[in-house]
């Protein structure tokens, strides 16, 4: 589902409907969401009703409609809403669509004015985290979703647990903290302003907290 359940009244709160059926709930691991409508705060609503169930973010796309090749337009917003925003609302995993897509660049570096998708029978407006040049099937171009994944995976290791954070807050700062299985800590921070910010982690806790 999308966060707003596509505005279909009989689908609103769909996970709750399943979880409220004790027999059906036994066979459901959790709920999965896309971000093409609504607000990610719905993740917290679902978690609070069924904290024992998994939450997984399973799809978001970039393309011609949202400046998908322009990192200045998409990287920070993608990292905040997908990379950190979902995790801070109890998602245990995040995937994006699609990891790699073939694109006809017509000899040009991809931009919103060139290098348009060319996939008969497929999405004609979508870019992948990585675009593969169809002319040589070798040249690749990395987009915002690729760099979002790279930033996170550079410090957050498989099996890491998100830990609670508290202290000074700033409207221009978004962050999430983790403890890796080897005992090391990871701290992912987004600075949405054009000014430098000084942030000093001083202590750690295993308490999980949600986004506010």
Report each predicted region and the residues it spans.
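Carbohydrate-binding surface patches
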Residues: 154-157, 165-204
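Acidic, glycine-rich loop-and-strand cores that form catalytic or ligand-binding grooves
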Residues: 145-158
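Conserved small/polar residues in nucleotide/adenosyl-binding loops
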Residues: 205-212
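Conserved, mostly hydrophobic/aromatic
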Residues: 31, 149, 187
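A structural motif corresponding to the C-terminal end of an alpha-helix
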Residues: 24-27, 86-91, 152
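Noncatalytic carbohydrate-binding groove/subsite architecture in carbohydrate-active enzymes
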Residues: 1-80
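Active-site proximal loops enriched in glycine and acidic residues that flank catalytic Cys/His/Asp
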Residues: 2-4, 35, 57-62, 95-99, ...
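Aromatic/acidic polysaccharide-binding cleft in carbohydrate-active enzymes
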Residues: 57-147
